[in-house]
Amino acid sequence: MAASLQAAATVMPAKIGGRASSARPSSHVARAFGVDAGARITCSLQSDIREVASKCADAAKMAGFALATSALLVSGATAEGAPKRLTFDEIQSKTYMEVKGTGTANQCPTIDGGVDSFPFKAGKYEMKKFCLEPTSFTVKAEGIQKNEPPRFQKTKLMTRLTYTLDEMEGPLEVRRRRTLKFEEKDGIDYAAVTVQLPGGERVAFLFTVKQLVATGKPESFRPFLVPSYRGSSFLDPKGRGGSTGYDNAGALPRGGRGDEEELAKENVKNASSSTGNITLSVTKSKPETGEVIGVFESVQPSDTDLEAPKDVKIQGVWYAQLESN
């Protein structure tokens, strides 16, 4: 913020001319300094050199404070950045009013201390409070430039901060040779999300890990079910739908051009579920409390209009508590 204020208060050299330059302070800054909001601070070459320098310096300071104040008003709560990540006990100790509007409710807890390994012995556990918090969404799509191959592109989130999956649970089996198997059974295991590509196209999907069966080692254990984002009666902008609407928008397309598969994706609507894959990695654990944290990367299809899905890559952090059976 100090760098922003310094940049805002810097005066760029200007060409000296015969016309007077003026600056009008904003109403918020004017009230703070006791200046009329409608008043103008004028710097004229007809005045004494010292008076000119003094007035111009005052005008520059006023403009700098006005710019900095406007930036704070526009940025609002984001001026301080993301909230500090709290432990599970710290979150539980806070009241509703202390959490409201801070962004903490959309975050997974972290661990204070712990070890950089997975020291849990072989056996059967119950994984509870399983939380998945995305930190980035990228969508595989063609680039803006012509003939650019499809690649995962950064997106802009269009929905509110309600995309974190939480309170999930299921059995976890720690086998010999440090292999794991986890089955997701219950919890808030899906969230509707819409993101926007750089070209303006919006992609809707359900971020989910329904019926997840993850197996592997703690460094990387991973298909899961991706329900349809929309129902079969949904109609796309051209009136095509699964159980209602047109089969094709207008006349049937002429075949033989090599684009039959692409046209079928757009025309034949399908509301059935698809599958996705996720990779979970353990980065730290706390054996005395049974807490585990890590990072994940999930690749699943989107469901913009019941077909022609795009691949969505979701990366983020996760948290869980293990209880021995």
From Swiss-Prot:
Q: Which organism is it from?
A: Triticum aestivum (Wheat)
Q: Which InterPro entries match?
A: OMP/PagP_b-brl, PsbO
The gene is: PSBO
One Gene Ontology term of the molecular function aspect: oxygen evolving activity
The processes (GO biological process) annotated in the record are: photosystem II assembly; photosystem II stabilization
Where in the cell does this protein reside? Answer: Plastid, Chloroplast thylakoid membrane
- Membership in a protein family: Belongs to the PsbO family.
- SUPFAM superfamilies the record matches: OMPA-like (SSF56925)
Give me the ranges of the annotated region Disordered.
236-260
Look up the domain of life of the source: Eukaryota
Q: Which GO terms describe its cellular component?
A: chloroplast thylakoid membrane; photosystem II oxygen evolving complex
Q: What is one Pfam family matched by this protein? A: MSP
Transit peptide location: 1-79
Supply the name of the protein: Oxygen-evolving enhancer protein 1, chloroplastic
Sorted keywords for this record are: Chloroplast, Manganese, Membrane, Photosynthesis, Photosystem II, Plastid, Thylakoid, Transit peptide
Outline what the protein does. Answer: Stabilizes the manganese cluster which is the primary site of water splitting.
